[in-house]
Regions:
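A charged, aromatic-enriched C-terminal amphipathic alpha-helix characteristic of glycosyltransferases
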Residues: 352-382
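Conserved donor-binding/catalytic core segment of Leloir-type glycosyltransferases
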Residues: 4, 165, 217-233, 239-242
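Nucleotide-activated donor-binding/catalytic signature segment of Leloir-type glycosyltransferases, i.e.
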Residues: 261-282
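Carbohydrate-associated surface elements
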Residues: 170, 192
Length: 385
């Protein structure tokens, strides 16, 4: 099949581990012709900018086309309804499947126009990455206006959309409640990890080398956490939880946001190793070196990547986020106070309960977090059709 991805709302870079990179990569590995259409927006060393039009083949086997973003003509909606002009491209490429990333860009109407005029058998898929934490809420006037605008946008295309995926159960519910997507059109397409980066055959080597690098004994219980660190991630509370624990170390892979840096540094202690920002290609080695992943706060894509690394995990409990527990690989915590975090660590530190979690994590149940499996699921309705 020929598949065109349209991703108007996020910067794209080669080598990143985001869905826009990995879903096309693994669909291409399945033998499909894949094109990714993104904006000319770039992101280098934490600085955003723009490039010129580009059309090239990525190292991962799919074609990338960069186009300038188009802003809506009314000033107060310029960014709200930004889009890419893709209709002519779709007519030229004649895709069998269009995967439109997000529910907030009018670009999807051009996909619908292509389906109506050129290829009635084309399958149109959308996904949603927004929720009540990182989306908009309806408790203010702006939020209510956005809800009306985006609901109308979806309503105008619903008849021609085959499936809408939430990347978590909560985000599936958000698509239903905020955008008005019918329940029967909704499904979950989780995020995960790049199979090619998971070097399970050398897991023991990573464990030995990285522990030696950071001065961690093999018999110490190593907890890993990280990401973009801010108040909502609650990693500072986990730092307090390990402060007085013997034989326990906390390895943090990530950097604190500028407004949280001073607070973060005040919680550093001898049981905490601050590894700084780790490139995504190297992050899996740190998961292999660890005994437990622990994320007490807001969701991060590292959650699913830790699950894919077959590492037992503890997560802060969020409604609609139970997809990261598949067969017993994870535990959830209602409370993030340091005392409760400490109790959970002691409950799991090389205990029989931990061994059960480890067995579940190492089983094939956690293969669902691999992008090779996610890519297959993303095309199920196209194959059935």
């Amino acid at each position: 099949m020929k598949i065109v991805h349209v991703a108007p709302n996020a910067p794209y870079e080669e080598g990143w581990s985001y869905q826009e990179n990995l879903l096309p990569k693994y669909q291409a590995k399945l033998g499909h012709q894949v094109i990714l259409v993104v904006s000319t927006q770039r992101h280098h060393q934490s600085e955003q900018g723009c490039c010129s039009f580009e059309d090239y083949r990525s190292d991962d086997g799919y074609r990338v086309i960069r186009q300038p973003i188009r802003l809506f003509p009314l000033p107060f909606l310029r960014r709200t309804l930004q889009h890419l002009e893709v209709y002519d491209l779709l007519c030229r490429e004649k895709p069998d499947v269009i995967f439109h990333h997000g529910l907030i860009s009018p670009s999807v109407r051009q996909a619908v126009r292509y389906k109506k005029r050129i290829n009635p058998d084309c399958v149109i898929l959308q996904d949603n990455h927004m929720d009540y934490n990182i989306g908009f809420t309806v408790d203010c006037l702006k939020g209510r206006i956005l809800k009306l605008i985006y609901r109308q946008l979806y309503r105008s295309t619903d008849r021609y959309i085959n499936k809408v995926y939430g990347v978590t159960p909560w985000r599936k519910d958000y698509a239903r409640d905020i955008f008005g997507v019918p329940e029967e059109k909704l499904d979950i397409l989780i995020m995960g990890a790049d199979d090619d980066q998971l070097d399970f055959a050398n897991r023991d080597r990573y464990r030995t080398e990285l522990r030696q690098k950071h001065g961690i004994r093999d018999d110490e219980f190593l907890i890993v956490t990280g990401g973009k660190i801010d108040q909502k991630k609650k990693i500072h509370l986990l730092m307090d939880a390990v402060k007085e624990l013997e034989g326990v170390k906390l390895l943090i892979c990530g950097t604190a946001t500028e407004d949280f840096l001073e607070e973060y540094q005040s919680h550093l202690n001898p049981n905490v190793i601050d590894a700084g920002w780790i490139p995504s290609q190297q992050l899996y080695g740190y998961f292999f070196a660890s005994d437990l992943a622990f994320f007490p706060g807001q969701h991060s894509v590292l959650w699913e990547q830790a699950c894919a690394s077959k590492l037992p995990c503890v997560f802060g409990k969020w409604e609609g986020m139970d997809h990261v527990n598949n067969g017993g690989n994870a535990r959830f915590l209602d409370c993030s106070a340091p005392e409760q975090l400490r109790d959970m660590i002691l409950q799991l530190r090389f205990t029989p309960e931990y061994q059960q979690m480890l067995a579940a994590a190492r089983s094939d149940k956690t293969d669902i977090y691999l992008y090779s499996r996610i890519a297959e699921k993303s095309l199920e309705c196209a194959v059935r059709k």
